[in-house]
Amino acid sequence: MFPELPGYPAPKNDNFFLIAGPCVVEGEEITLRIAREIKNICSELDIPFFFKASYKKANRSSLHSFTGIGDEQALAILREVKEELHIPIVTDIHTEGEAVWAAQVADILQIPAFLCRQTDLLVAAAKTGKTVNIKKGQFMSPESMRNAVEKVREAGNPHVMLTERGTTFGYQDLVVDFRGVKAMQENRCPVVLDCTHSLQQPNQPSGVTGGRPDLIETIARAGVAVGFDGLFMETHPEPPKALSDGANMLPLSELKPLLVKLLRIRKAIL
């Protein structure tokens, strides 16, 4: 399935779609650079592309972690990406009050995994009329996400999608149960695999979340093989210098070779 977005018709091919970008808006130049490069890659490969970057990061390990360059400035940069490059925008919200404001720019409002049970937040996002992407909590079963989907639909918005981002495995690790895609697709909505956050290693004593970016290709290949509708990847030209989530990002230079491999898998299973 493909997300229904006004102004962005569904593709005529059967490729998966891609949600990708940096974790957070770091500045105008680098954000536009990343968006432009991903767009060029996806245009060449005929992959539908949605640009994702948070305009603020509310859920951080440490009080001293980077949270953003300023809400208004970050949203203005996302608007520039949207208008200059004609790319649909995905960004996350954390409170009901952010929904209407972020919806002025975003085409898809993303609900963070830790907040996927927050009824008021889901309803507020739904009432904007924008597509709502709910990330499955690390503590939630695939089957239980039906309730989150129903909250959005019963608020009057049929445009909803789900994202798998791993399940807590002990104190400092996550695993992906690939059986879950079938259960989530039974909600008759697009289901996405987050190939980078599902490889996080949270709760580190340092206060900085770790990750296994060396396994991004493994997770992505498995996700395409089992039939996820879309893939989510955070990427950056220099992940070690990224201001958020650098430990589990895909280097931007590795994106195109990976997508080429994934398209071959997609073609083989259709």
Regions found by a protein language model. Give the residues of each.
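N-terminal amphipathic alpha-helix/helix-capping segment at the start of soluble metabolic enzymes
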Residues: 1-18, 76, 267-270
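Structural preference for beta-strand elements that scaffold enzyme active sites
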Residues: 15-19, 48-52, 88-90, 107-108, ...
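Glycine-rich, proline-tolerant flexible connector loops at the mouths of alpha/beta enzymes
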Residues: 18, 22-31, 49-71, 236-245
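A cross-domain feature marking catalytic cores of carbohydrate-active enzymes
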Residues: 22, 51-55, 91-93, 113, ...
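Alpha-helix-loop-beta-strand connector modules within alpha/beta enzyme cores
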Residues: 37-40, 44-45, 64-90, 125-131, ...
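Active-site-adjacent loop and "lid" segments of alpha/beta metabolic enzymes
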Residues: 64-72, 108-115, 171-178, 199-224, ...
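Catalytic beta/alpha-barrel core
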Residues: 69-70, 84-98, 107-120, 131-142, ...
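Catalytic alpha/beta core domains of metabolic enzymes, predominantly
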Residues: 129, 133-235
